[in-house]
């Protein structure tokens, strides 16, 4: 039927097309005939007659070519005569219908869609494929593709069509093969060689380098925070540099101070680990070692700080002077340093005398030059002859000496004075040795015991065993009585015993000194005074102290000076002399000095004494030279291993003396005890004086380099920042991170605390004594507040010894008083909210509040009261305060009652008592302002004020799209929510109807009166009476409102107590909670914070959705299709589908994404159901109008006329109809003309 209807439709189209063509032919034929009636064209040689045109009919003749007859428009334009050729092609419709193929019939479906029509028109169909169900669009496209890839006919070459995707894959495979070849040839040998090279030592080295780079990166990262962005940061950096310099000056030279060593460790840890990432348990972001607190403390002194102007040299010198003042001056200097300073001073004096240009200055410079030469020659003489002198010649022998010999004699005399100084210092050292050797013995064994084997400080097992063997051989001795006394508190009796022991030790030392043979030089004659330079031999000097042979010496010197003409030679000779002496002298440039001849030969007059045997042999040995003697004098470093035998012998003598000596009573003991008993440093510590000198030298060099760099630059933010950064970096490299200082700190702490492991950085843990903080953190995972953090850290710092007890925060920072100026300048921030209740009597609510006007009225009474409060003294000397209450309580209206008088007197008395506090209306230093107190009392649990979030857009999504399945966040009716929109059949428990009374309770009227008396007027409307029906929200909100405001000042706790709350609790009715049907969903998500520096991790944004498919009542085909789509995500046994989404940044987005994915899967699976109708917009298509319209007879079903039986019209009949139509049109047109 369908094919027959299509063929009829096609035949009708053909018939209409033929009618349309015949009509056109008729019109063309008629136009050709009308044109033939016109006059013929003129022949050649004749003129064409001109048409006569009337001007009046010009406008009308323009359109005269067209004649409108109402129905037909006829064209009168002239056309060239053409013979119309009628196409008389014959079309046999029977033959056309018979020639229709199945392809034509099938293509009629796609006549409305040209793209599909074109696609299907390319293929050839068989009659057998008309009703083939397996034919799909995919198979047709595959056939079309194969057809396109066929070889062209007559082609000599094979056509290769390459798709881009295939070509890209080929290229990727080629690159992968090349990479594999490279790995086989080069990478594997390199990896094997790398694994052979890397061993344990290399790993340690790499680890150390990595740690250094990590420290540099962290320091660089922290340094960027100090870039200047304003004056405030500039001052902060200045404070930091000032504190760093001050800290360096006070602690580096402070000796074995344990607190300073701990402070340096803490500062190093703060620089290397500013965020305290090396802690164990304290994982909150507030633990920053109190850095912000230190910065705020430094701001107290920032107004007194003036930034240094590094472009000004005077400012740089002031900084150097500041460092010199901070450093403790060490007067106990090395003799070489003293000698070099003396020589430098004399050289400066010589230069100054030469610069004067006068004769006196020249004489003075010559005298100083001669003295300097004599002193240098005397030092050289002592070094050459091992600090021994021959016998001085007699005056008779001196008269025979030449001038050279006299000069040499003067050198020997000066050497004698220096030798006496050295001998005196040696005697002092010997006494010092006897007094301190016993203490050194005990300290040596104590340090030996302190450095016992320990796993903490041992590098490997062999080192541990060797140290253990040494400690076992050394042994340990029991604690003596003196050591036990040192550990006990020093009472007066203990101090006396200790004094007596000190006296006994001095006696033992004296006895041991007498027993030992003295190794000193025997003094046959009394030693002359060192201060008298001419006391050695007075025969050579006159009464005025002038040398007798000075004239000869001056003449000889004049001859030598004449030979010297160039000053440069003299300077070079002096420089060579100084280098020979190897004395570090700070010689300034352009300093003129004298010519010095190095002493390489012995004096001439000593040759005579050598013959007589009076001169000791010359030995150029360096054992007892002046330099080594000075080191033995000033740097006392005993070698305990070499002197162990001598020490043991002295210990035996001391023990024997203690055994033989009788113990004296306490009253007879004498002696003095130093209150500050300082323990000597351990032997492993470096020399503190040398270490301090090294640090100071490095600091001065770094400061000098920085000052020279910025000496002439403009002072702005950039230069100031660079200078501050460089100073701070130099401070860290020279002071904090110096290897010797780190080792010094560790040994200092070990000296004080024993053999302990010293941490590289400090970290803190929670203290279990703070039970409220531990409960709050462990149970509720809440971070510490700032006040709690200060409390915990100060407590821990005092326990570790890093803070003193008086520095601990004793008062809460929230309760700190505020300055009066701050309150007066900000009246809005500090409102006077307690003005009405601060002085009210809690028992009497009718008291008048104290205001400014009230105080001004009683101001004369206050002045009079102060006058009456004059302090007088009795005869006994006691102070008496005279207060006359009757004069103070003076009423203006004497006719008032006695009760009113008493009340007014009380008000006056309270005004007088608070006169010093309320004299200012705004400021009260004892008042706690509202922004300095917490809004809710913190008792260790979560207590957050209620806050309702406004919903900008109403949630109109379905339950599957709604992220808020439990309605947490939008308003709802509590009663309908709990009863699930069911009527409330349960009666109210404690609500009585009129006339009903519950036995055992008070009368309702009495109860209402009690409530009315206790409650305040402000809350009266919130408490319902018994005759009212309570609302569901009224009870809960009032209870929460009062519970949050309990014990708070602004909630008037004296007016509303717990009794009111309990009465409200009795009225509350709790309805049973019923089950609410929800979708069978289960979301699995994580809320753990993995790192404090990252806002959220990938685990937190991951959303897992588990769906119970059995709850959806799906058909078997849909379930199978869903299982086929989801593969292993679907569990066929439990019928649970698991979907995961983690592509989005937040958890709500991933939840929405996984729910959308489930909806898509459910829709796709439902398409397998043939009865499923999709209403989605992407799948819905509007129905197309039917192309076949049945006839009226077909609608009425009266008769059925098939087109094939009726037959098609013959060609003759059709031509006849056309001629009839043609004649009709022509006759109609002729009638109109």
From Swiss-Prot:
InterPro entries: Ribosomal_mS35_mit (IPR019349), Ribosomal_mS35_mt (IPR039848). Residues 513-529, 882-905 have a biased composition (Acidic residues). Residues 32-51, 510-529, 882-915 are annotated as: Disordered. Transmembrane segments: none annotated. It comes from the Eukaryota. One of its GO terms (biological process) is mitochondrial translation. It holds the Pfam family MRP-S28. GO terms for molecular function: structural constituent of ribosome. GO terms for cellular component: mitochondrial small ribosomal subunit. Residues 906-915 have a biased composition (Basic and acidic residues). This is Uncharacterized protein DDB_G0279527. It comes from Dictyostelium discoideum (Social amoeba).
């Amino acid at each position: 039927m369908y094919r027959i209807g299509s063929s009829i439709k096609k035949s009708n189209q053909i018939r209409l097309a033929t009618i349309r063509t015949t009509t056109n032919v008729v019109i063309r034929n008629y136009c050709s005939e009308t044109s033939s009636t016109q006059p013929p064209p003129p022949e050649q040689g004749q003129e064409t007659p001109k048409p006569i045109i009337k001007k009046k009919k010009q406008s009308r003749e323009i359109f005269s070519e067209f004649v409108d007859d109402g129905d037909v428009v006829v064209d009168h334009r002239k056309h060239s005569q053409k013979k119309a050729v009628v196409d008389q092609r014959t079309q046999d419709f029977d033959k056309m219908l018979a020639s229709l193929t199945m392809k034509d019939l099938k293509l009629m479906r796609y006549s409305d869609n040209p793209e599909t029509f074109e696609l299907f028109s390319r293929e050839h169909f068989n009659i057998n494929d008309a009703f083939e169900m397996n034919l799909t669009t995919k198979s047709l496209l595959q056939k079309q593709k194969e057809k396109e890839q066929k070889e062209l006919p007559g082609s000599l070459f094979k056509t290769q069509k390459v798709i881009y995707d295939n070509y890209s894959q080929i290229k990727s495979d080629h690159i992968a093969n090349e990479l594999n070849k490279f790995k086989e040839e080069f990478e594997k040998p390199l990896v094997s060689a790398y694994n052979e090279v890397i061993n344990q030592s290399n790993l340690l080295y790499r680890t150390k380098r990595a740690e250094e780079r990590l420290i540099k990166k962290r320091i660089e990262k922290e340094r960027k925070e100090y870039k200047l962005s304003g004056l405030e940061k500039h001052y902060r950096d200045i404070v930091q540099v000032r504190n760093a310099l001050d800290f360096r000056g006070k602690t580096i030279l402070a000796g074995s101070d344990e607190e300073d060593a701990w402070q340096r460790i803490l500062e190093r840890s703060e620089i290397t680990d500013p965020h305290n990432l090396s802690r164990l348990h304290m994982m909150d972001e507030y633990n920053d070692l109190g850095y912000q607190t230190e910065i705020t403390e430094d701001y107290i002194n920032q107004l007194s700080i003036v930034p240094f102007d590094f472009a000004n040299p005077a400012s740089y010198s002031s900084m150097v002077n500041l460092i010199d003042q901070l450093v403790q001056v060490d007067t106990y200097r090395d003799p070489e340093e003293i000698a070099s300073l003396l020589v430098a001073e004399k050289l400066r004096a010589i230069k100054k005398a030469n610069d004067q240009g006068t004769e006196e200055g020249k004489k003075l410079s010559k005298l100083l030059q001669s003295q300097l030469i004599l002193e240098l020659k005397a030092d050289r003489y002592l070094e050459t002859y091992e600090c021994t002198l021959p016998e001085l010649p007699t005056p008779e022998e001196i008269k025979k000496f030449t001038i050279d010999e006299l000069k040499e004699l003067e050198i020997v005399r000066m050497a004698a004075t220096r030798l006496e100084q050295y001998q005196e210092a040696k005697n002092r050292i010997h006494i010092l040795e006897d007094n301190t050797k016993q203490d050194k013995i005990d300290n040596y064994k104590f340090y030996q015991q302190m450095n016992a084997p320990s796993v903490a400080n041992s590098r490997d097992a062999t080192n541990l065993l060797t140290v253990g063997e040494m400690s076992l051989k050394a042994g340990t001795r029991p604690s003596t009585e003196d050591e036990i006394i040192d550990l006990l508190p020093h009472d007066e009796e203990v101090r006396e015993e200790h004094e007596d022991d000190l006296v006994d030790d001095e006696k033992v030392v004296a006895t041991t000194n007498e027993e030992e043979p003295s190794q000193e030089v025997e003094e046959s004659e009394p030693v002359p005074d060192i201060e008298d330079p001419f006391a050695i031999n007075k025969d050579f000097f006159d009464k005025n102290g002038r040398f007798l042979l000075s004239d000869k010496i001056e003449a000889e010197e004049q001859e030598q000076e004449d030979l010297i003409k160039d000053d440069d030679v003299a300077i070079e000779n002096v420089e060579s002399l100084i280098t020979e002496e190897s004395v570090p002298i700070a010689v300034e440039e352009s300093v003129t000095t004298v010519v010095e001849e190095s002493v390489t030969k012995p004096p001439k007059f000593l040759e005579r004494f050598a013959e007589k045997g009076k001169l000791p042999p010359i030995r150029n040995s360096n054992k007892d030279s002046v330099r080594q003697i000075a080191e033995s004098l000033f740097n006392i470093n005993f070698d305990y291993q070499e002197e162990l035998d001598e020490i043991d012998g002295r210990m035996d003598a001391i023990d024997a003396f203690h055994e033989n000596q009788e113990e004296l009573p306490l009253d007879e003991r004498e002696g003095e005890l130093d209150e500050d008993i300082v323990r000597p440093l351990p032997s492993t510590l470096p020399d503190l004086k040398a270490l301090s000198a090294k640090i100071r030298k490095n600091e001065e060099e770094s400061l000098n380099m920085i000052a020279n760099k910025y000496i002439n630059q403009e002072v702005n933010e950039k230069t100031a920042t660079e200078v501050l950064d460089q100073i701070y970096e130099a401070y860290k490299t020279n002071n904090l991170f110096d290897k010797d200082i780190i080792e010094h700190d560790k040994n200092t702490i070990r000296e004080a605390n024993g053999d302990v492991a010293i941490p590289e950085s400090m970290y803190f843990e929670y203290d279990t004594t703070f039970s409220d903080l531990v409960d709050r953190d462990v149970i509720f995972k809440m971070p510490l507040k700032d006040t709690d953090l200060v409390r915990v850290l100060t407590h821990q710092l005092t326990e570790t010894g890093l803070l003193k007890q008086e520095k601990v925060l004793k008062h809460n920072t929230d309760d700190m008083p505020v300055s009066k100026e701050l309150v007066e300048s900000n009246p809005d921030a500090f409102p006077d909210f307690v003005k009405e209740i601060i002085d009210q009597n809690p028992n009497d609510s009718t008291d008048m509040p104290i205001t400014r006007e009230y105080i001004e009225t009683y101001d004369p009474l206050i002045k009079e009261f102060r006058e009456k409060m004059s302090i007088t003294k009795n005869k006994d000397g006691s102070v008496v305060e005279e207060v006359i209450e009757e004069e103070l309580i003076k009423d203006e209206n004497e006719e008032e009652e006695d009760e009113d008088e008493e009340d007014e007197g009380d008000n006056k008395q309270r005004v007088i008592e608070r006169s010093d506090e309320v004299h200012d209306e705004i400021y009260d230093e004892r008042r706690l302002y509202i922004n300095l107190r917490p809004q809710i009392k913190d008792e260790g649990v979560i207590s957050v004020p209620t806050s309702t979030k406004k919903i900008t857009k109403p949630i109109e999504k379905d339950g599957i799209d709604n992220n808020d399945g439990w309605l947490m966040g939008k308003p709802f009716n509590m009663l309908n929510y709990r009863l699930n929109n069911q009527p409330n059949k349960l009666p109210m428990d404690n609500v009585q109807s009129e006339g009903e009374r519950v036995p055992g309770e008070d009368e309702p009227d009495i109860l209402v009166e009690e409530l009315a008396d206790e409650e305040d007027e402000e809350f009266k409307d919130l408490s319902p009476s018994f005759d009212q029906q309570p609302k569901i929200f009224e009870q809960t909100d009032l209870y929460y409102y009062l519970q949050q405001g309990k014990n708070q000042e602004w909630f008037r706790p004296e007016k509303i107590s717990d009794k009111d709350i309990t009465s409200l609790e009795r009225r509350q009715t709790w309805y049973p909670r019923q089950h609410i049907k929800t979708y069978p969903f289960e979301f699995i998500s994580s809320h753990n914070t993995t790192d404090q520096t990252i806002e959220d991790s990938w685990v937190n944004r991951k959303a897992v959705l588990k769906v119970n498919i059995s709850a959806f009542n799906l058909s078997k085909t849909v379930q199978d299709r869903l299982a086929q789509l989801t593969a292993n995500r679907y569990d066929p046994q439990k019928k649970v589908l698991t979907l995961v989404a983690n592509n989005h940044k937040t958890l709500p987005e991933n939840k929405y994404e996984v729910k959308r994915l489930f909806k898509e899967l459910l829709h796709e699976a439902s398409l397998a159901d043939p009865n499923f109708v999709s209403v989605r917009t992407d799948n819905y298509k509007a129905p197309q109008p039917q192309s076949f319209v049945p006839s009226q007879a077909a609608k009425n079903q009266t008769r059925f006329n098939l087109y094939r039986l009726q037959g098609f019209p013959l060609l003759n009949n059709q031509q006849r109809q056309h001629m009839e139509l043609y004649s009709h049109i022509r006759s109609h047109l002729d009638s109109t003309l």
